[in-house]
Amino acid sequence: MAKDSPSPLGASPKKPGCSSPAAAVLENQRRELEKLRAELEAERAGWRAERRRFAARERQLREEAERERRQLADRLRSKWEAQRSRELRQLQEEMQREREAEIRQLLRWKEAEQRQLQQLLHRERDGVVRQARELQRQLAEELVNRGHCSRPGASEVSAAQCRCRLQEVLAQLRWQTDGEQAARIRYLQAALEVERQLFLKYILAHFRGHPALSGSPDPQAVHSLEEPLPQTSSGSCHAPKPACQLGSLDSLSAEVGVRSRSLGLVSSACSSSPDGLLSTHASSLDCFAPACSRSLDSTRSLPKASKSEERPSSPDTSTPGSRRLSPPPSPLPPPPPPSAHRKLSNPRGGEGSESQPCEVLTPSPPGLGHHELIKLNWLLAKALWVLARRCYTLQEENKQLRRAGCPYQADEKVKRLKVKRAELTGLARRLADRARELQETNLRAVSAPIPGESCAGLELCQVFARQRARDLSEQASAPLAKDKQIEELRQECHLLQARVASGPCSDLHTGRGGPCTQWLNVRDLDRLQRESQREVLRLQRQLMLQQGNGGAWPEAGGQSATCEEVRRQMLALERELDQRRRECQELGTQAAPARRRGEEAETQLQAALLKNAWLAEENGRLQAKTDWVRKVEAENSEVRGHLGRACQERDASGLIAEQLLQQAARGQDRQQQLQRDPQKALCDLHPSWKEIQALQCRPGHPPEQPWETSQMPESQVKGSRRPKFHARPEDYAVSQPNRDIQEKREASLEESPVALGESASVPQVSETVPASQPLSKKTSSQSNSSSEGSMWATVPSSPTLDRDTASEVDDLEPDSVSLALEMGGSAAPAAPKLKIFMAQYNYNPFEGPNDHPEGELPLTAGDYIYIFGDMDEDGFYEGELDDGRRGLVPSNFVEQIPDSYIPGCLPAKSPDLGPSQLPAGQDEALEEDSLLSGKAQGMVDRGLCQMVRVGSKTEVATEILDTKTEACQLGLLQSMGKQGLSRPLLGTKGVLRMAPMQLHLQNVTATSANITWVYSSHRHPHVVYLDDREHALTPAGVSCYTFQGLCPGTHYRVRVEVRLPWDLLQVYWGTMSSTVTFDTLLAGPPYPPLEVLVERHASPGVLVVSWLPVTIDSAGSSNGVQVTGYAVYADGLKVCEVADATAGSTVLEFSQLQVPLTWQKVSVRTMSLCGESLDSVPAQIPEDFFMCHRWPETPPFSYTCGDPSTYRVTFPVCPQKLSLAPPSAKASPHNPGSCGEPQAKFLEAFFEEPPRRQSPVSNLGSEGECPSSGAGSQAQELAEAWEGCRKDLLFQKSPQNHRPPSVSDQPGEKENCYQHMGTSKSPAPGFIHLRTECGPRKEPCQEKAALERVLRQKQDAQGFTPPQLGASQQYASDFHNVLKEEQEALCLDLRGTERREERREPEPHSRQGQALGVKRGCQLHEPSSALCPAPSAKVIKMPRGGPQQLGTGANTPARVFVALSDYNPLVMSANLKAAEEELVFQKRQLLRVWGSQDTHDFYLSECNRQVGNIPGRLVAEMEVGTEQTDRRWRSPAQGHLPSVAHLEDFQGLTIPQGSSLVLQGNSKRLPLWTPKIMIAALDYDPGDGQMGGQGKGRLALRAGDVVMVYGPMDDQGFYYGELGGHRGLVPAHLLDHMSLHGH
């Protein structure tokens, strides 16, 4: 059997070959087991590393949690301790306050009781003193009167001895009593001071919590208590010597009073003893010692600490006994000897006894016998015995009295004092107990609260402690929960470690210190489990293979044993793996809750941190809010300070204003004095009156010129001092001339060959007006009246000189004034004739027969009137009242005053008629001053300081005005001043106005503005202030300034002040500055592009539109808005857009333009987010562009005898791209070359501004005077002028301002123009074709024949036609007059429906001589063409499609009309049957119209979604190219149509070039008005009570307001104007003209 046993290597020794495979298998298995063991070891090492990592993490978390818990606990503990300390400190302070209050209350009680006891003692003492004095008096009387010395038989020696003896006895008693009383008082004071100090020490020791006061009571007081009392025996005091002089008994009574008061103190001190043995006060002299001894014994038995002792009395007590008790002084000195006392006088002797000598007290002379001495001795002994008995009796009575009066009260006082002392003692004890309890409470609160304590402070501490504990528990709940979770995790880890350590592999680690305490990772366990399962499967496969191989080979028993052993090992390994798998699963299940708990703890921790962060943020926000509140409070305080300073400044300004008012009052008084002085000097002027008349008659100067020279300054001076007017019909009397008189004068002027109208520029005046034309009497009076009529409402316009009077133009003529001045040298011109009239009757012009009484003056009998000139043809004078009013005066109501009576008849209120009587030198200075002021004022009024326009001729004219006219005016003013004329006539009131006038702002944009003014002197610079800050200084001669960098939409205040040199500031110049306010525009719209050019493209049918883009800033903005692109418009219609802010060109195709057209204009607008800009300067499309497309060419004058046709008049216009070359160069080649000069003349007339308010008569002589060589330069100047006008019109931002310049109303120019137009063969590119739709007409032949007959008659009657005008021109002029008469006849039937508009319709030949260049009735055609009268409503516009496009059907394109007035057919229709087919519309409503007018002058229209007929006379057509945006009709060329403007007040709509000119339904020739800017001269309140119901629709004015006026003045003297966004009627006589344009 031993041989068969297997070898250790698994092979048989006999059969090594057979055992080798089994050995190899075993070796493989062994290697695999070792490999498995190595893997297990590696896994265990990984597990141990994971355990260490988790342990470190757990330790770190535990440490962090512990650290946080400690920090939180420390923070909470510190907060709790701080709060507890604050509470304790508050409790201590409260208890301290209570204790101090109780002590103060106790002291007050004690002081009150002391005061009461002291008062009582004072009263008792006073009673005792009185009793003692009475007893002493009685004793002295009894001793003196009843003694032996008073007997008749007694000798003088015995009497003297008796008195001496008596005095000795009294002095001895007094000394004994005083010494005893002083000792007692000192003792009682020392005892009281000791008790007081002890009481204070006790209070400080027990109630303030401080140690007791160190030291002992006052040593003097203690010593005074310990020293023995002085002896009370009589032997201790030496008797006084008899040789001393004796005092009177009065001093004795005083000493007794002092002793009694001291005794009162002793009794009060003794009454405080606890036993109360002392019941009475000493009532006699011999009872002092026993009472004081008893008091001393009772005082010695008192305790040293007593709370019921008396405090020292107040220091203000005046009595000696009530003074404050101080430490005991040194013992009292011995009393003075008895000789110091005075004798008490008896009642009978009175005061006389005091003066008795003291001989009675001297010893008797030594001459008596022995018996007599014995007898005397016996008598003295007997008297002494009687006196002793009497003293004893008195002593007993005193005792009885004291015992009867005081004992009960003293006992009661003692009892009360004892009770109070007991109460004070108990209160002190309670206070000490309370302090001790507080100390114990503090100690318990610091250490630990003791339960069961009933003290209030302890309860509060407990409540606070519980609250803090609750807060701490709530705040620490999170850390505690986290600690619990960490502890649970730790326990679970311990359990897991124990389970791992108890496994089968624990024996491998026994040598390393016991079981492992590491953490197992669940993932690692899962991975290990899967790997173990794979190993088991692999081993099972190997075993199966081994079993299969073992069946093939027959093995021995050793092989089966080896297999069994391996099988057993495998099973053991499988069991171990299953056990490990179960453990891993258990660990995984336990680790999941632990992980969840850890995550929850982390979540709670994060929540706590977030809460802490939120609290910190809240705290920061509250802190910031607190800081902000503090800052606001600081700002408020600062604002209050500023407000206070502003109030102070306001008060100072008020004081300064009062001072200035006082100065002004003084200046006014001085001025009144100066006005009174010249009146006194009138008597000195009479001798020189004839010399003045001689000067007036001197030839060489027309008499009207000086008057007119000073007339305009006077109007301005009066305009500044007129009172406030209210709108009544009577108030307009000062502004309107007589209408009938003016019509007659105008009619006469129409037939006069003299040209009164002046052209728009100064060179034309100097060249065209003949120098030798005389002025007739009627002409001079007419010019005076016309200028007088417009004086109140207007002043000459500075830039254009449009409204200069005829006399002012004569001043500019070199032949009339300047040449005369040059030839005459310094000779003064003749002065006008001044006459003074007196009113004989009362006269009210409104009650007279005249139709227009506004221009006449109301007269009162006795009034003085200053008359200028001669009487006119109607019997009226031009006069002025003494209050400054001017007007017409009827000659039959006044009577002239002879010259001899003038110095004595002038009223006190009349103007100054002579110089003031001043000392030598001052009168000359005053006269020179007035002449200077009048000269400067005249220069301003005559337009001498106007802004110079471009052109050499204008500069020459200005130089002429500056150099020559000043000399003329100076001489005139000197002459008038010497004559004694009034200062209003001289144009000044004695104070020169140096301030610049007529401040005007123009070109106001969002960021800039231009201001112009008329300076009073061109020799001084001006300072420009913006918002009361100096902005710029303009040099002398400059009257404009441009502001840059302004803020959009901001209100500014501009002030212009003249800066005078130092030497001129010494004179009072009056106002030196003028102020105007304005608002800058809001940002936008952008500026339009520049230099628009239209050119043909290389491709046919294509145009290239190029422009210069607007200037934009870095942000791409123009005028404050963002630029987005450009829009191209052709005749007001948008054709394309370019979405590029920097684009400069685009391409237009032929299909984009409106066809057919003879020509078009292209404009470009800048697009932005806020809308589009205004139109740029339009560019004309090349003419050959349309020719290449074969446009149907229409002759310029066409007529068709069929249906109502369209008449078109071609006249030249000035496009903005017009070059400086003569207009003839632009004309078509079909025009003859001779047309250049007439076209230049026509352009000159076309560019002209609206005519002046002077005369409706045209200047016929101005035509043809200019040579043809100057046509080009004139056209150039006019083109520049029109360019400036265009800019100014664009600046006004009003749709009514965008209008072409009206054609001049000069008939010669119009006829000349029409003549040349008739000769043209084709339309020129610079002409506009206008058409007028006409109604029913006469036959051409009949009309022509009738007109020719009328024209021949008029041609024969008129002989003033200039020879240079041709026959056709005369024919056209006469034809114009005939047309006007026929139109007046045709308009008669239309006035029935316009009667409520009649008040606003101007009369023919109105004072404003403005007219349209295109006649309202009908346009002229060729001489052979038929003439048609025009209907009431006309449309002058450019045809869009030619005549062939106009139709009468509904398919015709709709046109837009605007209603000129309200219309209700049921009320206003002439045909009530057809009223149902008519439409109702309102004024300013837009209507859509199809076709043309029918035979009844009606249109087919749509209004309010209803279709019907509308009367053509009440509507006017707008341009075709309108489009509706935002539910409003909008015109592309001018923006939105006016929604507020009253169109009937405009006398026609003004529309830009290329669009239709809309006129009103009036057949007469009405002017096309340009809005004017005027300034209010006075205040005006239409809502005044005097107005009644007439003030509705009128504007309220303030002096200096700038008003935009539309249209002419109506019959009632009103303009239609706009102020501050409101529109209404404005009285014309309260407005003055302002300069609208300036360069």
From Swiss-Prot:
Residues 832-899, 1452-1520, 1569-1636 form the SH3 domain. Interacts with LRGUK (via guanylate kinase-like domain). Interacts (via C-terminus) with HOOK1 (via coiled-coil region). It holds the Pfam family SH3_2. The gene is RIMBP3B. Belongs to the RIMBP family. Residues 776-790 have a biased composition (Low complexity). Residues 21-143, 409-442, 480-619 form a coiled coil. SMART domains: FN3, SH3. Residues 1392-1406 have a biased composition (Basic and acidic residues). Residues 326-339 have a biased composition (Pro residues). This is RIMS-binding protein 3B. Keywords: Coiled coil, Cytoplasm, Cytoskeleton, Differentiation, Repeat, SH3 domain, Spermatogenesis. Residues 995-1083, 1088-1184 form the Fibronectin type-III domain. PROSITE patterns: FN3 (PS50853), SH3 (PS50002).
